[in-house]
């Protein structure tokens, strides 16, 4: 079994899509090992997206991510990183396939409902960024 990190973004939380997204996750044979809702501050969002610091969209991304609450999750399952990325769909919802989270719920390239780790290594980093050892179910 493998773990991956998932995040339901502010636009999806504000549109009351948490339950619908979790339903899709669970129907695709993921086990939710940990979950919490939080409001990121600017420092937390800048730290989480530090890899994009030099990109022109960085400040807009940070502003968006602190615009409302998020839901962070640890998902567990076979090939969790790859399978969750497939379930999310393409970053740009216009390119996402039917049946994916982003095709179903994304508004735009920025307001694309969810985030997911892009590698095993980043899954560990992102899980550790949001969850301490006491918040995880093995």
From Swiss-Prot:
SMART domains: NDK
InterPro entries found in the cross-reference section: NDK-like_dom, NDK-like_dom_sf, Nucleoside_diP_kinase
One Pfam family cited in the UniProt record for this chain: NDK
UniProt-listed PROSITE patterns: NDPK_LIKE (PS51374)
Necessary cofactors: Mg(2+)
Cellular component terms per the entry's GO annotation: cytoplasm
Claim: Amino-acid biosynthesis is one of the keywords in the record: no
UniProt keyword annotation of Kinase present: yes
CDD domains attached to this UniProt entry: NDPk_I
GO biological process assignments: CTP biosynthetic process; GTP biosynthetic process; UTP biosynthetic process
Its EC number(s): 2.7.4.6
Assembly notes: Homotetramer.
Known function: Major role in the synthesis of nucleoside triphosphates other than ATP. The ATP gamma phosphate is transferred to the NDP beta phosphate via a ping-pong mechanism, using a phosphorylated active-site intermediate.
Protein name: Nucleoside diphosphate kinase
Name of the gene this protein is made from: ndk
């Amino acid at each position: 079994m493998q773990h991956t990190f998932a995040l339901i973004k502010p636009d999806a939380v504000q549109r009351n899509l948490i339950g619908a997204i979790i339903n899709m996750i669970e129907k695709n044979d993921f086990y939710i090992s940990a979950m919490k809702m939080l409001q990121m501050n600017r420092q937390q969002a800048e730290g989480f997206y530090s890899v994009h610091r030099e990109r022109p969209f960085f400040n807009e991304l940070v502003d968006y991510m602190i615009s409302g609450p998020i839901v962070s999750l640890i998902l567990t399952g076979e090939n969790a990183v790859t399978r969750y990325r497939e379930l999310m769909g393409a970053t740009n919802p216009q390119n996402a396939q039917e049946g994916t989270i982003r095709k179903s719920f994304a508004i735009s390239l920025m307001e694309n409902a969810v985030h997911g780790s892009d590698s095993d290594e980043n899954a560990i980093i992102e899980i550790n960024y949001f969850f301490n050892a006491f918040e995880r179910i093995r």
